[in-house]
Amino acid sequence: MEVISTNTNGSTIFKSGAIPMNGHHNGTSKHQNGHKNGTSEQQNGTISLDNGNELLGNSNCIKPGWFSEFSALWPGEAFSLKVEKLLFQGKSDYQDVMLFESATYGKVLTLDGAIQHTENGGFPYTEMIVHLPLGSIPNPKKVLIIGGGIGFTLFEMLRYPTIEKIDIVEIDDVVVDVSRKFFPYLAANFNDPRVTLVLGDGAAFVKAAQAEYYDAIIVDSSDPIGPAKDLFERPFFEAVAKALRPGGVVCTQAESIWLHMHIIKQIIANCRQVFKGSVNYAWTTVPTYPTGVIGYMLCSTEGPEIDFKNPVNPIDKETAQVKSKLAPLKFYNSDIHKAAFILPSFARSMIES
């Protein structure tokens, strides 16, 4: 078997002609999280299943030249993209970093085998994580971004002319290097005079931040495993609340309602203990994330009341209060802002309980 990328959580890219075989961390025998996918061995063009049945070797279920994402956070399922070209593969001090050109979504960034952003499919995530919080407060001036080292989040934030200072704290310098090489139009924004890029630990930075300094904090983190784990714990939220001005807001990614309600409920419980303004959960659709959706926690500190569900600072063209030379928004508008807080009955009952 010829493998050009095997990541620690089991995701793999196979070259043409490569066939997954038993015993490799490619998801065909056993994931690192200990879950089997029901296959045991391959012989003579067939894949034998644990129940004694067989899949034909020419089945469309397995194809060479595809990236497949496996994770302990979504056991029993995987997401695949056809790979046109591997652009970068490396291991930083914190995680495996890979960038490839996909057939459908442009460049795809993965960290430890999990898709973080796609060039042509990730804009719903970045537009919402920025405009849900900043559209909910008038005249944001000082903002902190935790993570976001590729630069998509910063790109969206620069739509607001009231912004005076943006601090970005990215733990992984390799992610920033990938941005500079493969996304120069994004990395150029790191040179904006309002922007300070810090290579370091986001949790430590927030803990040391000046009290009541920021109008908004955006936590553009990966999943709650590996280097991002601390960004979902109560001590981190306490530090965030301290760093926000009265009536300041925070937005952090908060997983999928289809798979992670147990994680979401814990995040909400932590936030309700810390943030004395309001605590809200919103969600949106992102085609390349597990289950096709992602959630956000939106919280405010005690002070001027923040109504996240009714934007006071919208930036869509119909109600534009913000003028920008950037390209038009592709996803966000005032209606989607309001709709993001409408939850399915099962999720609403669990979150409100």
Curated annotation (Swiss-Prot):
Family: Belongs to the class I-like SAM-binding methyltransferase superfamily. Putrescine methyltransferase family.
InterPro entries attached to this UniProt entry: PABS, PABS_CS, Putrescine_N-MeTfrase, SAM-dependent_MTases_sf, Spermi_synthase, Spermidine_synt_N, Spermidine_synt_N_sf
Domain annotation PABS: ranges: 64-301
Protein's name in the database: Putrescine N-methyltransferase 2
Region (Disordered): 15-50
Catalytic activity reported: putrescine + S-adenosyl-L-methionine = N-methylputrescine + S-adenosyl-L-homocysteine + H(+)
Binding positions for S-adenosyl-L-methionine per the UniProt entry: 95, 170, 201-202, 289
EC code(s) of this entry: 2.1.1.53
Protein's pathway: Alkaloid biosynthesis; nicotine biosynthesis
Enzyme class: transferase
UniProt record, GO biological process: alkaloid metabolic process; methylation; nicotine biosynthetic process; putrescine biosynthetic process; response to jasmonic acid; spermidine biosynthetic process
Active site (record annotation): 220 (proton acceptor)
Presence of the UniProt keyword S-adenosyl-L-methionine in the record: yes
